[in-house]
Amino acid sequence: YLQYVVESRPTFFTVWLGNADLLQFVTSGGTRPLTEVGTFSANVKLLFDALAEQGARGVVTNLPNPTLVPLLMRPSELAAYRKDTFTPYWITTGAGEIRPATDEDRILMSADSIGFLTRSGFPKGFFKIAPLGNDDVLDADELDRVQQATAAYNATLTGEAGARSWPVLDANALFQKTKTGYLDFYGNRVETDFIRDGQLLSDSIYSVDGLHPNARGHALLANEFIAVINKVYQAQIPILNLSQFEGPRLAR
């Protein structure tokens, strides 16, 4: 990819690196490794050096907190969504401990077979003898690890961009704001969660996989890029109206 960047001779760029390095850990319940900070930093520097050598200008984006994606649910949220009254859920932590889940942990929305009988004869997730697997859960320690990695990656991105006088789009702050919800310039409601009280919310910026932005989410991100480009590079690109872009929907 680095060679491709050099050969393409870019004059303008947008860079958003590192999401996959974090999300491979998140989506696997912490069973897949995080990219070492040193490796991430070295790769960022190589790419940024290649872009700078071309004399290109652009926008660098930092990384949002990956633990805010709808894929991850607090046990209390999952119980309300599933209408489970027999709780707590039992989980297997990254350290191999089997214990009741707390709201300091997150259970993946994709966790399968919850409540189905296991070989032990007990329903999965509701008894110590039949806990959710480590790959179904991000326990409190794993959440801390991925948040520390996010902070380290962002320090690299911000530092390397600043050394070259490139602006940084603060996607981390943006996604923190969408978690609580807000109204945009056009009065459109913007939020992260796409299910509330068992109902699908049309205002969410996420697809129903709980991980990737939908059309509405990509339009929101485009507006953030446009705002930075217009401000820093004195462009006059019009922003998008999110109401023209579809939110989450189930396949028919």
Give the predicted meaning of each segment:
Residues 1-35, 60-77, 115-137, 204-205:
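Oxyanion-hole/transition-state-stabilizing segment in secreted/luminal serine hydrolases
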Residues 3, 38, 42-45, 49, ...:
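Solvent-exposed, polar/charged alpha-helical surfaces in well-ordered, non-transmembrane soluble domains
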Residues 8, 31-42, 144-151, 212-219:
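Soluble non-cytosolic domains of exported or imported proteins
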Residues 53-57:
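A short helix->loop->beta-strand "cap" motif at the edges of active sites that frequently abuts
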Residues 60-62, 168-173, 233-242:
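Surface-exposed patches in mature extracellular/periplasmic domains of secreted proteins
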Residues 73-148, 155-211:
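Mobile gating loops/cap/lid regions near enzyme active sites that modulate substrate access
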Residues 193-251:
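Histidine-centered active-site loop/cap adjacent to the catalytic His
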